[in-house]
Amino acid sequence: MAPKRPNGADALEKPAQATAPRAKRPAGLYAALDLGTNSCRMLIAEPRGSGFHVVDSFSKSVQLGLGLEKSGRLSRSSMARTVQALRICQQKLKKHKVRRMRLVATEACRRAINAKEFIARIHRETGLRLDIIEPEEEARLAVISCAPLVSPKTENLLVVDIGGGSTELVWIDIGGVPPTDRPHAIMRLHAGFKTGQRDRPQAQVVDWISVPLGVATRSEEHTSELQSLTNL
């Protein structure tokens, strides 16, 4: 009588299951929000090599500065529209778990007499903390955002940033900077247009100006003029 075979003797050996590779930890996301006189815009992006990959974005015309020229104040309807838009931004930031962000407000909030109260309301209703930045900082941010577009052959650069309520012009001299380092020299411009490093050739701000005129303010002026002519 043949000996009894042990259980499982005819079973094929199961191949070892390959361990699933661990998912790479996502790179930290960055967000930038610009609350202007006419629009509220936000980008959420992750670093990719020497640039960024946009993960999410938001843009809406909130007309925050509508009526500001006459009253000097942000209107109730304008503030309500803006808070509604910022709630959407807050939801996107929460969805993507963004921890590194810069949220700024510009000309309309610089000029409005009730801007501080509005910024406090934004924080109270959305949890977002917006900083009202000075014209010089707005101009600096416009300049460094153009750095990747600068050709190594460029020696002088004029940056014009036309917004809803203000326009900034900045003249930069990078002729003394080695051609391959010119975009980086612009990126090194710090607050007050000062460079943080003195051991290498620097970008020089020859002159700059910020004027309280933009697309929205000019449109409002022309609308008022047309209404005056209609009433004649």
Where are these regions (language model features)?
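Primarily the dimerization/phosphotransfer
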Residues: 38
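Nucleotide/phosphate-binding catalytic cleft detector across ATP-hydrolyzing
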Residues: 1-35, 43-162, 170-224, 228
